[in-house]
Structures are given as C-alpha cells and as structure tokens.
C-alpha cells in the first residue's frame, strides 16, 4: 500500500499515514518500520510504502519504508 505521512508525534514514537487509495488514516509505530528505516528520519509529507494489519483501534501499518 502507498500513502503520505500526515502527522508524526516524535516524542511518543508514532504517527499517521493518509493512504493513496482514499481509505481511512493508518496508525504507525516506530517499532514497525522496515529494517534500516529510522523513525528520526521520517517527516510529515514523506511518501511511504507499507503493509496493513488490523489493530486494537483500527488499521496499523508495518514494514513501513520510503516509496
């Protein structure tokens, strides 16, 4: 799946992605990034690729990487 990082909460270690397909925002956590992708390097507006799985409060991204 592809999308754009909408919001990053650096001090909490998570953020939200707006998927390109128009579906609901997807939560991501720093612990679910692809290897060699560093949370500190991510910026709002970055285009990313990711996989999605159901989470406790909605869809969650994992294997997050730059597009």
Please give the residue ranges for each predicted region.
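Compositionally biased, low-complexity repeat tracts
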Residues: 18, 51-54
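Absolute protein N-terminus
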Residues: 1-2, 67
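OB-fold/S1-family single-stranded nucleic acid-binding modules
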Residues: 53-67
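Short nucleic-acid-contacting surface segments enriched for D/E, G, S/T with interspersed K/R
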Residues: 36-49
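S1/OB-fold single-stranded RNA-binding interface
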Residues: 4-33, 38-39, 60-63
């Amino acid at each position: 799946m592809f999308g754009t990082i909408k919001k990053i909460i650096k001090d909490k270690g998570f953020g939200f992605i707006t998927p390109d397909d128009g579906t609901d925002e997807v939560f991501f956590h720093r612990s679910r990034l692809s290897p060699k992708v560093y949370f500190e390097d991510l910026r709002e507006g970055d285009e990313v690729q990711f996989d999605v799985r159901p989470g406790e409060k909605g869809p969650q991204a994992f294997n997050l990487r730059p597009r």
